[in-house]
From Swiss-Prot:
InterPro entries: AB_hydrolase_3, AB_hydrolase_fold, HSL_N, Lipase_GDXG_HIS_AS, Lipase_GDXG_put_SER_AS. GO terms for cellular component: caveola; cytoplasm; cytosol; lipid droplet; membrane; mitochondrion; nucleus. This is Hormone-sensitive lipase. Disruption phenotype: Total acylglycerol levels are unaltered whereas diacylglycerol concentrations are drastically increased in white adipose tissue of knockout mice when compared to wild-type littermates. Phosphorylation by AMPK reduces its translocation towards the lipid droplets. One of its GO terms (molecular function) is sterol ester esterase activity. It comes from Mus musculus (Mouse). Monomer and homodimer. Interacts with CAVIN1 in the adipocyte cytoplasm. Interacts with PLIN5. Gene3D superfamilies: alpha/beta hydrolase. It comes from the Eukaryota. One of its GO terms (biological process) is cellular response to cold. Its EC number is 3.1.1.79, 3.1.1.23. Pathway: Glycerolipid metabolism; triacylglycerol degradation. The active site is at 423, 694, 724. The gene is Lipe.
């Protein structure tokens, strides 16, 4: 169904439903249903012309006719998904609204949530339209003055995001992946609730399991808490959360479900300089020095994975480099050594430059080792913010050169070498190749970079707008990772009283807090179920109950019990009962209930949860909801909105997001998209695999276009309906398996020697 037909069908159904519920009397539920359909009609009619314009020019930004992908197309596709869901829901309501089994409260909650999402998508479409008018033809990233980019960011971070993390979570992705995203979001908000209080690791995870029940049954609360976390918690929180997969119990479970390999060994490469021959003249050599930046010389860790035990992999030299990881279970009898492979894959993992290791990526790397039949050498580089740029690049380059020189120890002859990585690892694959060319040593025979980030500048692009709704790559989290990697992140110190507790004091404190959380979690579950059933829970007399009262006003969802109340008795969950005026207007409500709920949802005040989003006083926060002050001499982005349209504003009070104007983010070894032509011409064939709904999509499209313009061999494959990081979700569903298989095909293409020319 084309966009215009879909919009017209939705408008017709909305008008029919609006007329029906308007005639149902003065009841609160009927009034809200009528209002929400009026809002759907208004937003759909306002959005359709803008989407049509974006779609009409989107082909100018594609790599070629065979690869129709860029941020403008992705925004239109996302808006169509939202419109399609509203169309489906409107049809359902029209067909079942007279039935005694019609769940008015459930359908109202979904309609209000998706109307809020549609309103925000309309704002994003206007942003994209503004970019379209100020960018050069064919350019996706804004290249103008930094003031306008800062104004974009200032306007952008004030938009409300919670609607995308509640009932609408992951609506743009394939349905098979949405349950995982919901589980991830519940785990995130539960983990964030205990972060900075239980600092000793596993207790945070354990407490989250017992106290996160209310987030599972209350999508609105989950969305509000998700928004608070992504805007206020620092990069150390994200390191801790993303590294949950490093916990031995979880990693063991993941390995049980993955392919069994003969070799999976962690190696420690000594920080000793060695010589490498120059490709221009092998008789000459260049010295490869160990990494020195920030922390001085230190061993570099890497993991060797091989499906078969090959010659050299159990040599005395390699055994001396092996690092103990505890006893490992040998599931199959020790085989005879297979001959060395003719190829080698050097892998660099992702994780935003701040988290994860090869252990997190081991499940899919084992599958690669089996399918490709070659050894895989995965580098564990030092992570930011403790080791900012260029430490990771130095370590990856050092480890790559070591692997090329000592490939016989890794079970390979090194005839063909592929550099492969995802996300931040894809960035490092490209920059390692640039550095190898600069040193004059052997570059890999090809690069496979999955959804890489190719520019770390704070530049607006249509695909970056998707970070407003992306549960894996929110804009503020991207900024925190960039800040950490570039070395501009403020140092975060533990509280002095925590240091004074000592190890035993921390254990005693965490045990006490864990038992308290267990009791409060059980009480929270009971209260939630009692509220959902229409019963009023008894008041607790526990002194610790005071600590959970600020969230009580957010806890109640739109439920049948709440909607069954007589008109005028709105209860305390006004946040869940937003009318269409509330959903489409950023002006503060005059309702005391709304004022109270907005106050309840305000940001946390402790300084230890503020990263680089500077604190502001309450008056500034209130003004920011209605007014975003422009910089001097800079056009206002708000002018992109037509008169009468007001997107929803965030209640979190975020007033600032740093603009990375430091020259370091323009370094070509940090942002290869900004590298001069002479450097990019030294790259080997590059194979990019991107996601159509990834905020990093435009990075891949523009990088491929630059290489294509230079005559460099490059391919770009864009997979549909999958989020950033699909390699780590390879076993989740058919779509992720197919996307992962395509990455394997690209690696296999690189490792295949070119056909000999015919005489």
């Amino acid at each position: 169904m084309d966009l215009r037909t879909m919009t017209q069908s939705l408008v017709t159904l909305a008008e029919d439903n609006m007329a029906f519920f308007s005639s149902q009397g003065p009841g609160e539920t009927a009034r809200r249903l009528s209002n929400v359909f009026a809002g759907v009609r208004e937003q759909a009619l306002g959005l359709e012309p803008t989407l049509g314009q974006l779609l009409g020019v989107a082909h100018h930004f594609d790599l070629d006719t065979e690869t129709p992908a860029n941020g403008y197309r992705s925004l239109v596709h996302t808006a169509r998904c939202c419109l399609a869901h509203l169309l489906h829901k409107s049809r359902y309501v029209a067909s079942n609204r007279k039935s005694i089994f019609f769940r008015a409260s459930h359908n109202l909650a979904e309609l209000e949530a998706y109307l809020a999402a549609l309103t925000q998508l309309r704002a994003m479409a206007y942003y994209a339209q503004r970019l379209l008018t100020i960018n050069r033809p064919g350019v996706l990233f804004f290249e103008g003055d930094e003031g306008l980019t800062a104004d974009f960011l200032q306007e952008y971070v004030t938009l409300h995001k919670g609607c995308f993390y509640g009932r609408c979570l992951g609506f743009q992705f394939t349905p098979a992946i949405r349950p995982f995203l919901q589980t991830l979001s519940i785990g995130l908000v539960s983990f964030g609730e205990h972060y900075k209080r239980n600092e000793t690791g596993l207790s945070v995870t354990a407490s989250s399991l017992f106290t996160g029940g209310r987030f599972a049954i209350d999508p609105e609360l989950r969305g509000a808490e998700f928004e608070r976390i992504i805007q206020n918690l620092d990069v150390h929180f994200w390191k801790a959360f993303w590294n949950i997969t490093e916990i031995e119990v979880l990693s063991s479970l993941a390995n049980m479900a993955s392919t069994t390999v003969r070799v999976s060994r962690l190696l420690s490469l000594p920080p000793e300089a060695f010589e490498m021959p120059l490709t221009s003249d092998p008789r000459l050599t260049v010295t490869i020095s160990p990494p020195l930046a920030h922390t001085g010389p230190a061993p570099v860790l890497a993991r060797l994975i091989s499906y078969d035990l090959r010659e050299g992999q159990d040599s005395k030299v390699l055994n001396s480099l092996a690092k103990s990881e505890g006893p490992r279970l040998e599931l199959r009898p020790r085989p005879h050594q297979a001959p060395r492979s003719r190829a080698l894959v050097v892998h660099i993992h992702g994780g935003g430059f701040v988290a994860q290791t090869s252990k997190s990526h081991e499940p899919y790397l084992k599958n690669w080792a089996q399918e490709l039949g070659v050894p895989i050498f995965s580098i564990d580089y030092s992570l930011a913010p403790e080791a900012p740029f260029p430490r990771a690049l130095e370590e990856c380059f050092f480890a790559y050169c070591w692997a090329v020189k000592h490939c016989d120890l890794l079970g390979s002859t090194g005839e063909r070498i592929c550099l492969a990585g995802d996300s931040a690892g894809g960035n490092l694959c490209i920059t390692v190749s640039l550095r190898a060319a600069a040193y004059g040593v052997r570059v890999p025979d090809g690069i496979m970079a999955a959804y890489p980030v190719t520019t770390l500048q704070s530049s607006a692009s249509p695909s970056r707008l998707l970070s407003l709704m992306d549960p894996l790559l929110p804009l503020s989290v991207l900024s925190k990772c960039v800040s950490a990697y570039s070395g501009t992140e403020a140092e975060d110190h533990f509280d002095s009283d925590q240091k004074a507790l000592g190890v035993m004091g921390l254990v005693q404190r965490d045990t006490s807090l864990f038992l308290r959380d267990l009791r409060l979690g059980a009480s929270s579950w009971l209260n939630s179920f009692l509220e959902l059933s229409g019963r009023k829970p008894q008041k607790t007399t526990s002194p610790t109950a005071e600590s959970v009262r600020p969230t009580e006003s957010m806890r109640r969802s739109v439920s049948e019990a709440a909607l069954a109340q007589p008109e005028g008795l709105l209860g305390t969950d006004t946040l869940k009962k937003l009318t269409i005026k509330d959903l489409s207007n950023s002006e503060p409500s005059d309702s005391p209930e709304m004022s109270q709920s907005m106050e309840t949802l305000g940001p946390s005040t402790p300084s230890d949860v503020n990263f680089f989003l500077r604190p502001g006083n309450s008056q500034e926060e209130a003004e920011a909801k209605d007014e975003v002050r422009p910089m001097d001499g800079v056009p206002r982005v708000r002018a992109a909105f037509p008169e009468g349209f007001h997107p929803r504003r965030s209640s979190q009070g975020v007033l600032h997001m740093p603009l990375y104007t430091s020259p370091i983010v323009k370094n070509p070894f940090m942002s290869p998209l900004l590298a001069p032509d002479s450097m990019l011409k030294t790259l080997p064939p590059v194979h990019l695999v991107a996601c159509a709904l990834d905020p990093m999509l435009d990075d891949s499209v523009m990088f491929a276009r630059r290489l294509r313009d230079l005559g460099q061999p490059v391919t770009l494959k864009v997979v549909e309906d999958l989020p950033h990081g699909f390699l780590s979700l390879a076993a989740l569903c058919r779509e992720t398996r197919q996307a992962t298989e395509f990455c394997v095909q690209r690696i296999r293409l690189i490792l295949t020697p070119p056909a000999a020319p015919l005489n």
